[in-house]
Every structure is written in C-alpha cells, then in structure tokens.
Amino acid sequence: SFSVNPAVEILQHRYMEKVAQNNRNFLNRV
C-alpha cells in the first residue's frame, strides 16, 4: 500500500482480508 504509517498499513491489511473473505462468502452463496 501507499502509506508510511504502520497503523494504517495494518488497518488496510485487515480491511483487504475482510473484503476478500466477504467476496468468498458471496461466491459460495451464489
């Protein structure tokens, strides 16, 4: 990612993991 702030890096990483998991759950339902 583009941030130099480690806390923001962690938040972005967690957000991307959550989005990826939501996408998998959505695909499994369809």
Curated annotation (Swiss-Prot):
Record localization: Secreted
Chief location bin: secreted
An example Gene Ontology CC term for this record: extracellular region
Keyword flag Secreted: yes
Valine amide: modified positions: V30
Keywords in alphabetical order: Amidation, Hormone, Secreted
InterPro entries: CRF (IPR000187)
SMART domains cross-referenced by the UniProt entry: CRF
Function summary: Regulation of fluid secretion. May stimulate primary urine secretion by Malpighian tubules and causes a dose-dependent stimulation of cAMP levels in the tubules.
Record family assignment: Belongs to the sauvagine/corticotropin-releasing factor/urotensin I family.
Record's protein name: Diuretic hormone 2
